[in-house]
From Swiss-Prot:
Extracellular side: 40-275, 323-334, 473-475
Family, as annotated: Belongs to the ligand-gated ion channel (TC 1.A.9) family. Gamma-aminobutyric acid receptor (TC 1.A.9.5) subfamily. GABRG2 sub-subfamily.
Compartments it resides in: Postsynaptic cell membrane; Cell membrane; Cell projection, Dendrite; Cytoplasmic vesicle membrane
Classification via PROSITE patterns: NEUROTR_ION_CHANNEL
Protein name per Swiss-Prot or TrEMBL: Gamma-aminobutyric acid receptor subunit gamma-2
Any one biological process term the GO annotation gives: post-embryonic development
Function description: Gamma subunit of the heteropentameric ligand-gated chloride channel gated by gamma-aminobutyric acid (GABA), a major inhibitory neurotransmitter in the brain. GABA-gated chloride channels, also named GABA(A) receptors (GABAAR), consist of five subunits arranged around a central pore and contain GABA active binding site(s) located at the alpha and beta subunit interface(s). When activated by GABA, GABAARs selectively allow the flow of chloride anions across the cell membrane down their electrochemical gradient.
Residue intervals on the Cytoplasmic side: 297-302, 360-451
Glycosylated residues, chain numbering: 52, 129, 247
Species annotation: Homo sapiens
Predominant cellular place of this UniProt entry's protein: membrane
Gene: GABRG2
Signal peptide bounds: 1-39
């Protein structure tokens, strides 16, 4: 009896399928622990983009592909020729973002504006076939392709921003669409109409067009119906308030052709706070101050004269200061009218006292009184019949020594000018008070001129202010 073959039995055991599967698992497990056999891609083969905390992997475009595309596009490209030359006009879509406006210089009639200006057009010579949809380029490519010769027609001075690099951007799409944007600071002309100053409103334009291409070559269109503006709270308008804007398109005919002109109008309204404090209130107070002389005794010549001269000189100074913030226009502004009328009121108050002082100081004794003083009999038998004053005491107003002057009228009278007939012209003298020609006329008493002025001057000034403010603010 032969002994059992142990090795052959073991060999049959190890050759079973179960053993083979176990060995395969162990081998794969050992290989996975070795780092050299792990399959990983380099981080440089992908670019990561974060969007709402979701990571999207996109293949990175080799720089060599962009260089090849640009070289192919610029090969044989002539940047001196516009797209579709000789075929059809080039259509330029324009857009604008207003970063800030101000300040407005009324003396030079100009304003400063900071904008981002964008132009879009199609150039079939710049089409390319690639998986790249758009080429995002910097300002170095601007001079290598055709760019519209757009200029700002009412610009006095324009500066492009160059810090830290030129603020220009260029985009080229694979279908030939080109986007060109740049940042500009422009000092633009604005013809201010100052008839209603300082209650004026203005529409300051910003106009641009092609410099050399008429509308048969280039046509401009607005990309959007309205121009976008930034935060108006940071604008340095100072004396003005921003009301709104509007954009228009028009054709301007010149000797060199018809050009499409694009315009943006910025509506501005002037704030009156500064001028109310600096001009209107001081002028009004000076006019009121000139009326104080009507309550000062007419015999106080130095007081009334110095007050009148001081108010006149002050009004002259105020009118000069008010004009400094304006250009030297040939027409009368609303402020000029107000200051001039105030000056007339102040000057009239001074003239009123001069007139009063002249006639009061040049009174002559009446002829009847002279006869009475010379003839004792007439002085003896001349007496007045007793009279009773039936007027209420409240109706008797004694102002500025008027009652005292009435008592002295018996001793002093007024004579007409030499060589004049009192019955043939209107005069203010006492001797002219009687006569048929005086019937229905108003007799003015020199002694009561201050009383009349106390009523006339304030009433006239209030009526002027009513008409002035209603006309300029509501009409």
């Amino acid at each position: 009896m032969s002994s059992p073959n142990i090795w052959s039995t073991g060999s049959s055991v190890y050759s079973t399928p179960v053993f083979s599967q176990k060995m395969t698992v162990w081998i794969l497990l050992l290989l996975s622990l070795y780092p050299g056999f792990t399959s990983q891609k380099s981080d440089d083969d992908y670019e990561d983009y974060a969007s709402n905390k979701t990571w999207v992997l996109t293949p990175k475009v080799p720089e060599g592909d962009v260089t090849v595309i640009l070289n192919n596009l610029l090969e044989g490209y002539d940047n001196k020729l516009r797209p579709d030359i000789g075929v059809k006009p080039t259509l330029i879509h324009t857009d604008m973002y207003v970063n800030s406006i101000g300040p407005v210089n009324a003396i030079n009639m100009e304003y400063t504006i900071d904008i981002f200006f964008a132009q879009t057009w199609y150039d079939r010579r710049l089409k390319f076939n690639s998986t790249i949809k758009v080429l995002r380029l910097n300002s170095n490519m601007v001079g290598k392709i055709w760019i519209p010769d757009t200029f700002f027609r009412n610009s006095k001075k324009a500066d492009a921003h160059w810090i830290t690099t030129p603020n220009r951007m260029l985009r080229i799409w694979n279908d030939g669409r080109v986007l060109y944007t740049l940042r500009l600071t422009i000092d633009a002309e604005c013809q201010l109409q100052l008839h209603n100053f300082p209650m004026d409103e203005h529409s300051c334009p910003l106009e641009f067009s092609s410099y050399g291409y008429p509308r048969e070559e280039i046509v401009y269109q607005w990309k959007r119906s309205s121009v976008e503006v930034g935060d108006t709270r940071s604008w340095r308008l100072y004396q003005f308030s921003f009301v709104g804007l509007r954009n228009t398109t028009e054709v301007v005919k010149t000797t060199s052709g018809d050009y499409v002109v694009m315009s943006v109008y910025f509506d501005l309204s002037r704030r009156m706070g500064y001028f109310t404090i600096q001009t209107y209130i001081p002028c009004t107070l000076i006019v009121v101050l000139s009326w104080v002389s009507f309550w000062i005794n007419k015999d106080a010549v130095p007081a009334r004269t110095s007050l009148g001269i001081t108010t006149v000189l002050t009004m002259t100074t105020l009118s000069t200061i008010a004009r400094k913030s304006l250009p030297k226009v040939s027409y009368v502004t609303a402020m000029d009218l107000f200051v001039s009328v105030c000056f007339i009121f102040v000057f009239s108050a001074l003239v009123e006292y001069g007139t009063l002082h002249y006639f009061v100081s040049n009174r002559k004794p009446s002829k009847d009184k002279d006869k009475k003083k010379k003839n004792p009999l007439l002085r003896m038998f001349s007496f007045k019949a007793p009279t009773i004053d039936i007027r209420p005491r409240s109706a008797t107003i004694q102002m500025n020594n008027a009652t005292h002057l009435q008592e002295r009228d018996e001793e002093y009278g007024y004579e007409c000018l030499d060589g004049k007939d009192c019955a043939s012209f209107f005069c203010c003298f006492e001797d002219c008070r009687t006569g048929a020609w005086r019937h229905g006329r108003i007799h003015i008493r020199i002694a009561k001129m201050d009383s009349y002025a106390r009523i006339f001057f304030p009433t006239a000034f209030c009526l002027f202010n009513l008409v002035y403010w209603v006309s300029y603010l509501y009409l």
